[in-house]
C-alpha cells in the first residue's frame, strides 16, 4: 500500500513546478490552503453521500478522491507520507481511549 502512496507523493511534488494551466494539482497549489481545504471538504461530503446512498464501488471511488486531495495537502504543507504512516504505526496497539486521553496530556 505504501508504494502507491509514495509514487503519488513523488508525482504531487513534481506538480509543484508545473504550470497551473496545465496541471490540476499545480492549480490547487497556486490557489493555496483554502482551496485545498475546500476540495477536501467537498470530497468528504461526497464520501458521506456515497456511504448513505451508494454501492461499495462508489464509496471506494469517493474515498480515493478524498485520499488524493489529502495527499495534495500533505505535499503542500511539506509533510511526507512516511510521517503519517509512522504516526499510525505509533498508535497501533494503543487503545483508542488511551490514545485520546494521551492527547490531553
Swiss-Prot record:
Keyword check for Cytoplasm, yes or no: yes
What Gene3D superfamilies does the record tag this protein with?
MazG-like
Transmembrane in keyword set: no
Q: What is this protein called?
A: Phosphoribosyl-ATP pyrophosphatase
Could you mention a single GO BP entry for this protein? Answer: L-histidine biosynthetic process
Where is it localised? Cytoplasm
Assigned keywords, A-Z:
Amino-acid biosynthesis, ATP-binding, Cytoplasm, Histidine biosynthesis, Hydrolase, Nucleotide-binding
What EC number is given for this enzyme?
3.6.1.31
Task: Supply the InterPro entries for this chain.
Answer: HisE, PRib-ATP_PPHydrolase-like
Its pathway?
A: Amino-acid biosynthesis; L-histidine biosynthesis; L-histidine from 5-phospho-alpha-D-ribose 1-diphosphate: step 2/9
Q: Which family does it belong to?
A: Belongs to the PRA-PH family.
- Organism from which the protein derives: Vesicomyosocius okutanii subsp. Calyptogena okutanii (strain HA)
* Catalytic activity from the UniProt record: 1-(5-phospho-beta-D-ribosyl)-ATP + H2O = 1-(5-phospho-beta-D-ribosyl)-5'-AMP + diphosphate + H(+)
Any one GO CC term of the record: cytoplasm
* Principal location listed in the UniProt entry: cytoplasm
Superkingdom of the organism of origin: Bacteria
| PANTHER family (UniProt xref) | HISTIDINE BIOSYNTHESIS BIFUNCTIONAL PROTEIN, HISTIDINE BIOSYNTHESIS BIFUNCTIONAL PROTEIN HISIE
Encoding gene, per UniProt annotation: hisE
Residues that span the membrane, as ranges: none
MF GO annotations: ATP binding; phosphoribosyl-ATP diphosphatase activity
Amino acid at each position: 500500500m505504501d508504494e502507491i502512496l509514495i509514487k503519488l507523493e513523488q508525482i504531487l511534488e513534481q506538480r509543484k513546478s508545473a504550470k497551473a494551466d496545465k496541471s490540476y494539482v499545480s492549480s490547487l497549489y497556486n490557489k493555496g490552503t483554502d482551496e485545498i481545504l475546500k476540495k477536501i471538504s467537498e470530497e468528504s461530503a461526497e464520501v458521506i453521500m456515497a456511504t448513505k446512498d451508494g454501492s461499495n464501488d462508489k464509496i471506494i471511488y469517493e474515498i480515493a478522491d478524498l485520499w488524493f486531495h489529502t495527499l495534495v495537502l500533505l505535499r503542500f504543507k511539506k509533510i511526507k507520507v512516511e510521517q503519517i504512516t509512522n504516526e499510525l504505526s505509533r498508535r497501533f496497539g494503543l487503545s483508542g481511549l488511551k490514545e485520546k486521553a494521551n492527547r490531553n496530556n
